[in-house]
Curated annotation (Swiss-Prot):
Protein name listed in UniProt: Virulence factors putative positive transcription regulator BvgA
Residue range(s) of DNA binding per entry: 166-185
Positions carrying 4-aspartylphosphate: 54
Transferase listed as a keyword: no
GO molecular function: DNA binding
InterPro entries: CheY-like_superfamily, Sig_transdc_resp-reg_receiver, Tscrpt_reg_LuxR_C, WalR-like
Gene: bvgA
Domain Response regulatory: 4-119
Keyword tRNA-binding listed: no
Keywords: Activator, DNA-binding, Phosphoprotein, Transcription, Transcription regulation, Two-component regulatory system, Virulence
Purpose of the protein: Member of the two-component regulatory system BvgS/BvgA. Activates the transcription of virulence genes.
Biological processes annotated in GO: phosphorelay signal transduction system; regulation of DNA-templated transcription
PANTHER family, per database record: NITRATE_NITRITE RESPONSE REGULATOR PROTEIN NARP, TWO-COMPONENT RESPONSE REGULATOR
Length: 209
């Protein structure tokens, strides 16, 4: 049976709730963890069929985990379960290789619907995400500006908005201070901002803090 699940989320209560729901529906939860590095380790060792993954996790963010899982070539599907705004993250997750995206603000039973669809070979994303990809958007809105950021740049922006220093960000992402400074410079350029205050305002305006 293709029903082995790995849960990666840094909220223990939510992990427990998802585990109970999935086991009730016949899925076998073979592992769970609160960070990206351990998540990758478990995925390599136990090779789940489905990874239920949050984006804002410590040590290695969810988008990076998706990319690394893809590079490993493991026969698994990734379902993102996150509180991050779908307007900014759903398309990015799809492009990174995720098969589904569910917002934590939805009824948690939506996770089961998504898991079943994903394991049946379908993708499961908000309808607006797919329609936006078909139509495109030429307006220079915040979301358009943010959409051109790399996954790493987006993570740095979020951490800056949370008040973290360059050193804290460097430690969190396993980067040098110089590399973080380079990312900050790129963010200022790409987001048409003139100061760190403007960057943080933009991030908070778009629920990235």
């Amino acid at each position: 049976m293709y029903n082995k699940v790995l849960i990666i989320d840094d909220h223990p209560v939510l992990r427990f709730a998802v585990r109970v729901l999935m086991e009730k529906e016949g899925f076998e939860v073979i592992g769970e963890t609160d960070n990206g590095i351990d998540g990758l380790k478990i995925a390599r060792e136990k090779i789940p069929n489905l990874v239920v993954l949050d984006i804002g996790i410590p040590k290695l963010d969810g988008l990076e985990v998706i990319a690394r899982l893809q590079s490993l070539g493991l026969p698994l599907r990734v379902l993102v379960l996150t509180g991050q705004p779908p307007s900014l993250f759903a398309r990015r997750c799809l492009n990174s290789g995720a098969a589904g995206f569910v917002c934590k603000h939805e009824n948690l039973h939506e996770v089961i619907n998504a898991a079943k669809a994903v394991m049946a070979g379908y993708t499961y994303f908000p309808s607006t995400t797919l329609s936006e990809m078909r139509m495109g958007d030429n307006a220079k809105s915040d979301s358009t500006l943010i959409s051109v950021l790399s996954n790493r740049e987006l993570t740095v922006l979020q951490l800056l908005a949370q008040g973290m220093s360059n050193k804290d960000i460097a430690d969190s992402m396993f980067l040098s201070n110089k590399t973080v400074s380079t990312y900050k410079t790129r963010l200022l350029q790409k987001l048409n901002a003139t100061s760190l205050v403007e960057l943080i305002d933009l991030a908070k305006r778009n629920n990235l803090a």
